[in-house]
Curated annotation (Swiss-Prot):
GO cellular component terms, semicolon-separated: extracellular region; secretory granule
Distribution of this protein across tissues and organs: Expressed by the venom gland.
Organismal lineage: Eukaryota, Metazoa, Chordata, Craniata, Vertebrata
Natural source organism: Deinagkistrodon acutus
Pfam families, per database record: Trypsin
Protein name: Snake venom serine protease Dav-X
Length: 260
């Protein structure tokens, strides 16, 4: 399910890791229909294909991963089965894209955040409701939930019609240093997974939420391929590092969005 990684460019660079912008949750199970009311699905045209996931955090704003952006993205809210449309399913497109450019010292890996303003507000319904930004950080060792329409196998690009969910665990960021020698792994990123292997996010899970202790703590960012390898957790962007920036953008303070 959450095996989201953008492999193409990384394979060209002959790197052993990949962005999760096209992965599914491996080792997961179909999410409960009422478990993911905030989950957004990004589709692109030509050809019409599922791209990534995102999280509805406000009636008119979706938070995702910057590496997922494509021109002309269609954003679906309230979707569960891609083949069966709910009556309250809503389709939107972005009229504004915002990227974190506040700290030039940060690498692209540390600011893989994208905030999209929808063309019109989304109506709350049976299958749609926003997810709040975190009020406090989780502890290392916390159990977290990941979800997405990413690939379900670490060896075959098999995409599901329905989102899959899985439980993983926050581990010390040092666990991600060795598996990702080409990424500056810092405390600005969450390192999470199942060290025994078998459960992970993967291709096209990118941009989806990492929910720990009921709070939206991370955004699916990067991981090694094949996904779900033992002692190879994945990396997630820490939402708490960007809450002030997000709130300022939503409030219309685009010229003063960066924290002092």
């Amino acid at each position: 399910m959450v095996l989201i990684r953008v492999l193409a460019n990384l394979l060209i660079l002959q790197l052993s890791y990949a962005q999760k912008s096209s992965e599914l949750v491996i080792g997961g199970v179909e999410c409960d229909i009422n478990e993911h009311r905030f989950l957004a699905a990004f589709f692109k045209y030509q050809p019409w294909t599922f791209q990534c996931a995102g999280t509805l955090i406000h009636e008119q704003w979706v938070l995702g991963a910057a590496h997922c952006y494509k021109r002309g993205l269609n954003i679906y809210l309230g979707m569960h089965n891609q083949s069966i449309q709910f009556d309250d399913e809503q389709r939107r497109y972005a009229i504004e894209e915002h990227y974190y450019r506040c700290d030039e010292k940060l690498t692209k890996w540390e600011k893989d955040v994208m905030l999209l303003k929808l063309n019109k507000p989304v109506r709350n319904s049976t299958h749609i409701a926003p997810l709040s930004l975190p009020s406090s950080p989780p502890s290392i060792g916390s159990f977290c939930r990941v979800m997405g329409w990413g690939i379900m196998s670490s060896t075959k690009d098999i995409l599901p019609d329905v989102p899959h969910c899985a439980n993983i665990k926050l581990v010390n960021y040092t666990e991600c240093v060795a598996p990702y020698p080409n990424i500056p792994v810092t405390t600005r990123l969450w390192c999470a997974g199942v060290l025994e292997g078998g459960i992970d996010t993967c291709h096209q899970d990118s941009g989806g939420p990492l929910i720990c202790d009921g709070q939206f703590q991370g955004i699916v960012a990067f991981g090694r391929y094949p996904c779900a390898q033992p002692r190879v957790p994945a990396l997630y962007t820490k939402v708490s590092n960007y809450t002030d920036w997000i709130q300022n953008i939503i409030a219309g303070k685009t010229t003063t969005a960066c924290p002092p």
